[in-house]
């Protein structure tokens, strides 16, 4: 067996390498330093007020964190989705709400990066990648949820424009200026179609933010479209092409959701570890007790398993050859990592004991944040159905 191993190594010139490259380490360190210096000190304020300070947005933009995976020619940092995962993990460790804002932004930009024309990319991606604008992705509706076959938002062709009417629910970043990818049924194909709409155009309005349980700062709002006039040149990938955009775009979105959950797991791990060393009982840190040691071990195991699965998804996203297989990998990663964040948050809370129930402690915020992941970008059972469908079809 060893002989075969060395033959393969010699033939291919290398073996599987789990070390981060210099470029990846640089992205990780940059995001970590920014998160610790600027986000962590105001994380509780963000959570309390459900608003991300503009100086945080400006700082993220200066570091090109809004455009890490995208090409430089469109204002991006050309850091790949692997770099995106590393940065998002560090941002999410400090604030799930800030990470959620970036994740939703990149969900929209990933759809543009694959399906937009050159002109559309330059017009809409460039300011968004630079952080001058923040993008949104508007699919979910009040009565029909996230079912593309039941969309009620309409797009009626009127000369060289479309007139959009409808309501979208739980839309991230809807209050920030920038492009919003809106899905509506057009009257020509009677199928879902993606439209690039500029937020705050005539007929565009929003609700107050929903008061959700966690990920505060990453606001969710309803979007109201009343006779919104959209140029035909703003159709994404052509009339009736909404479903492929949704399928692949949301798969890319799960890279961000998984990375955000991974950062939450790391935060739960670090908070539990720190508290176990600091909290004294009978003149010794509680880390001396075997029951606490078992919980710390579980946190370490869960973090490492989630970390490598998420890092792998980032690498896969750099070169998607088969959208169906990528959908499977994105779904299984998102399911595992988001479920694991729930488990890790609970374990860390158990280590804290009654103090974990107090909002003064970060672990309480992590616990409430953990509930969000399994419900967004497709609920957990739907993700399992995607995994099963592709697996059984092979």
Describe each region flagged by the PLM:
Residues 128, 143-146, 170-173, 185-186, ...:
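Short Gly/Pro-enriched turn/cap motifs at secondary-structure boundaries
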Residues 227-244:
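Long, acidic (Asp/Glu-rich), low-complexity accessory segments flanking structured domains
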Residues 150, 202-231:
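Flexible, small-/acidic-enriched active-site or ligand-binding loops
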């Amino acid at each position: 067996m060893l002989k075969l191993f060395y033959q393969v190594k010699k033939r291919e010139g290398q073996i599987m390498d789990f070390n981060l490259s210099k470029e990846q380490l640089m992205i990780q360190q940059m995001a970590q330093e920014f998160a610790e210096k600027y986000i962590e000190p105001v994380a509780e304020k963000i959570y309390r007020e459900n608003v991300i300070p503009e100086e945080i947005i400006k700082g993220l933009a200066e570091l090109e964190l809004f455009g890490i995976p995208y090409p430089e020619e469109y204002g991006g940092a050309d850091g790949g989705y692997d770099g995106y995962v590393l940065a998002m993990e560090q941002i999410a460790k400090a604030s799930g709400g800030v990470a959620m804002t970036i994740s939703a932004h990149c969900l929209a930009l990933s759809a543009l990066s694959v399906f937009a024309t050159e002109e559309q990319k330059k017009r809409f991606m460039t300011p968004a990648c630079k952080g001058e604008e923040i993008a949104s992705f508007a699919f979910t509706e009040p009565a029909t949820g996230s079912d593309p076959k039941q969309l009620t938002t309409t797009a009626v062709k009127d000369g060289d424009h479309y007139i959009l009417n409808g309501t979208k629910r739980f839309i991230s970043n809807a209050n920030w200026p920038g492009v919003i990818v809106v899905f509506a049924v057009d009257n020509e194909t009677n199928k879902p179609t993606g439209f690039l709409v500029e937020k705050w155009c005539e007929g565009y309005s929003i609700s107050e933010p929903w008061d959700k349980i966690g990920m505060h700062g990453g606001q969710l709002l309803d979007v109201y479209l009343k006779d919104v006039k959209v140029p035909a040149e703003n159709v994404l990938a052509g009339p009736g092409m909404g479903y492929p955009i949704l399928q692949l775009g949301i798969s890319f979105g799960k890279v961000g959701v998984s990375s955000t959950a991974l950062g939450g797991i790391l935060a739960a791990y670090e908070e539990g570890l720190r508290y176990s060393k600091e909290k004294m009982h009978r003149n010794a840190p509680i880390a001396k007790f075997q029951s606490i040691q078992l919980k710390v071990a579980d946190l370490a195991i869960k973090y490492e398993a989630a970390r490598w699965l998420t890092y792998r998804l980032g690498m896969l996203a750099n070169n998607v050859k088969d959208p169906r297989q990528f959908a499977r990998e994105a779904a299984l990663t998102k399911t595992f990592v988001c479920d694991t964040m729930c488990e890790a948050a609970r374990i860390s809370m158990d280590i804290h004991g009654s103090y974990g129930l107090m909002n003064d402690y970060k672990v309480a915020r992590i616990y409430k944040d953990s509930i969000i992941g399994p419900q967004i970008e497709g609920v957990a059972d739907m993700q399992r159905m995607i995994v099963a469908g592709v697996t059984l079809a092979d």
